Design a protein with these regions (language model features):
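Compositionally biased terminal segments of proteins
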Residues: 1-266
Length: 266
């Protein structure tokens, strides 16, 4: 579901303040697709340092107020700030947060949003979020990612490189343990079209089955990586395939890195 006009207007104004240390992240990065299941109900701006967070929040607030928006600060902490931004009867939340600089790819320039977290970093973060808090929005987002970006199994495998406290199996089990939602919860989300939670559950259980089968096939010593093809695109690895050894094992690093020719192969 594409971003709403109100959110787009805010993001357009804030794009001038974005840079590699202050960038758009969260679900906004992939929910702006026309085929996404829902519309994001807040705007997340991530930062690698506390200093950049504090500076960006002040700069963004000034830009919005200069353009006729009203800001109500509802949470102001050293590592996190949240404001409700409103104008002409419409409102949304903007959140400025500190986040680890450890990621798979560098923050990338974006014609609409200024600078954004790489979608695959956003996707692995989303899987970790689902296992950590189990929100319905995370559940639906992970289903969308599984069907359109990269499989649950491949994302969970890579996500463990960002949190050594998880194994891929444990990560998926925690997500599965929390994935129980009453139909009434759908009313809290801005959906592109009506969703059937029974059908979603079937898709989820199939994704979990496929993920566990994949974990049993992959070399344990490679946990925490994305598998990239010759075009540097993330793929679902197939260990039984003759092409598996040719896939690049791409690991996370501080501020991320683009794959290089010298990156090790299997």
């Amino acid at each position: 579901m594409p971003l709403g006009a109100f959110e787009k207007s805010i993001l357009r104004l804030l794009s001038v303040n974005r840079n590699p240390e202050s960038y758009i992240a969260g679900a906004t990065v992939f929910l702006r697709r026309e085929d996404s299941l829902r519309q994001s109900q807040d705007i997340d701006v991530f930062h690698d340092t506390v200093k950049s967070l504090q500076s960006a929040a002040l700069l963004d607030a000034a830009v919005l107020e200069q353009n006729g928006y009203v800001l109500e600060w509802v949470d102001q902490q050293e590592l996190f700030r949240r404001a409700v931004v409103s104008r002409a009867g419409q409102a949304t939340k903007v959140e400025w947060a500190y986040d680890s600089a450890f990621r798979f790819f560098p923050v990338q320039a974006d014609a609409e949003l200024g600078f954004v977290l790489h979608p695959l970093d956003g996707a692995t973060n989303k899987v970790l979020a689902l296992a950590g808090r189990g929100e319905l929005r995370d559940y639906l987002d992970v289903l969308f990612l599984h069907q359109n970006i990269l499989s649950l199994g491949a994302l969970a495998w890579a996500a463990c490189g960002k949190d050594a406290g998880f194994t891929p199996q444990f990560l998926v089990e925690e997500a599965q343990r929390l994935a129980h939602y009453p139909a009434s919860r759908l009313n809290t989300l801005l959906l592109r079209e009506p969703l059937d939670l029974v059908q979603c559950k079937r898709q989820w259980l199939q994704a979990v089955t496929e993920a566990k089968a994949l974990f049993n096939q992959l070399p344990p010593e490679e946990v925490g990586c994305l598998y990239l093809d010759a075009n540097h695109q993330a793929v679902i690895p197939s260990p039984a395939s003759s092409e598996f050894s040719q896939l690049r094992r791409h690991h996370g690093s501080v501020r991320g890195a683009w794959p290089s020719i010298s990156e090790s192969l299997g």
